[in-house]
A protein has these predicted regions:
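Short linear motifs in intrinsically disordered
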Residues: 1-4, 51-61
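Short beta-strand and beta-hairpin "edge-sheet" elements
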Residues: 70-115
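Short conserved beta-strand and strand-loop elements enriched in small hydrophobics
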Residues: 8-17, 59-74
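Charged, amphipathic alpha-helical segments
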Residues: 37-56
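One face of beta-strands
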Residues: 8-12, 24-26, 42-46, 63-65, ...
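Surface-exposed beta-loop interaction hotspot
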Residues: 2-4, 114, 118-122
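Solvent-exposed edge beta-strands and adjacent loop segments
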Residues: 2-43
């Protein structure tokens, strides 16, 4: 399947709807999927030069965090889902601005998540 990319402003928190520990522009790569369906497999990067945010990401490495992407550039609904994040090595990121993002669960591409939907007839 062909890959698609989206660039959107985003933030990472320790839990869903939590206070952000890092924020910046995110590049998300995923295989073409049905619009508005959750993305099970995706990866990306965040640009973040804030030293405190980078320290928080380093301290949380190996744990599941939460990514929230704001609507931008033709996407009219926020995207959100669990993520693991780690700083990219200084050999590949000499300016210390890149954070690698890896799926830790589906990335929901609409305002109401799958887990929040009310069953039919309820």
């Amino acid at each position: 399947m062909p890959a698609e990319t989206r660039t959107m402003p985003g933030r990472i928190s320790r839990e869903r709807n939590g206070d952000p520990i890092a924020s910046g522009w995110c590049l998300i790569v995923y295989e073409t999927a049905v619009r508005h369906e959750p993305l099970d497999e995706w990866r990306g990067e965040m640009a973040c030069a804030d030293p405190d945010a980078r320290q928080a990401i380093a301290a949380a490495e190996g744990t599941t965090l939460y990514l929230h992407l704001d609507p931008y550039g033709g996407e009219f609904e926020p995207w959100h889902g669990p993520v693991t994040a780690k700083l990219i090595s200084p050999d590949l990121d000499p300016y210390g601005r890149r954070i690698a993002l890896t799926s830790a669960g589906p990335l929901i591409r609409f305002r109401q998540g799958v887990e929040e939907k009310t069953p039919a007839g309820a």
